[in-house]
Amino acid sequence: MSKVVNLVRPVVESIIDEHGDMLVNMEYIKEKSQNYLRIYVDREPNGIDIDEIAVLSELISEKLDTLDPDPLPDPYVLELSSPGAERPIKTKADWEKALNDYIHVGLYQKIEDKKMYEGTLKSYNDDEIILEVKDKTRRKTLTVPRKLIANIRFAIEF
């Protein structure tokens, strides 16, 4: 399935870039008996609106329909959306944006008897991240080795 993404990514990315938006993620997956090409798009600094998503969807759909040979020979559904407030942190730009933001971290193994933390990302490097987390009534700093991170995403603080 990722072969399709590799084939269409340059086309999709050029259309998105022309509009001043950024490609966050793209996936081609099969759910039940239906194929989906899902494209997640964002715009700095305030996010992308539904009207811009509709414009991009139309342009991308038209362009994909003209490609020869067709990288998507089977019927599929094209879905464009914003990545959402709690999107995964994947790219260098995501990491920069997450700095001093509230995030969720899921771990492969426990640190201090917990496999999940939410807190403010204070710093990061290739080996570890530093989180400021709530511990009952006080805040503390937690160092998390990156190799222990199963998933990491933006989070909404309540």
UniProtKB/Swiss-Prot annotation:
One Gene Ontology BP term is:
ribosomal small subunit assembly
Protein origin, superkingdom: Bacteria
Q: Where in the cell is it found?
A: Cytoplasm
> InterPro entries in the record, alphabetically?
Ribosome_maturation_RimP, RimP_C, RimP_C_sf, RimP_N, RimP_N_sf
Q: Name one GO cellular component term.
A: cytosol
Q: Name one Pfam family in it.
A: RimP_N
Q: Give yes or no: UniProt keyword Cell membrane.
A: no
The answer on whether this UniProt entry bears the keyword Cytoplasm reads: yes
Name the SUPFAM superfamilies for this protein: YhbC-like, C-terminal domain, YhbC-like, N-terminal domain
Major place of residence: cytoplasm
Q: Which UniProt keywords apply?
A: Cytoplasm, Ribosome biogenesis
HAMAP family per UniProt: RimP (MF_01077)
Cited PANTHER family: RIBOSOME MATURATION FACTOR RIMP (PTHR33867:SF1)
Q: Which purpose does this protein serve, as stated in its record?
A: Required for maturation of 30S ribosomal subunits.
Task: Give the family, as the similarity comment puts it.
Answer: Belongs to the RimP family.
Query: What is the designated name of this protein?
Result: Ribosome maturation factor RimP
Species of the source: Lactobacillus acidophilus (strain ATCC 700396 / NCK56 / N2 / NCFM)
What taxonomic ancestry is recorded?
A: Bacteria, Bacillati, Bacillota, Bacilli, Lactobacillales
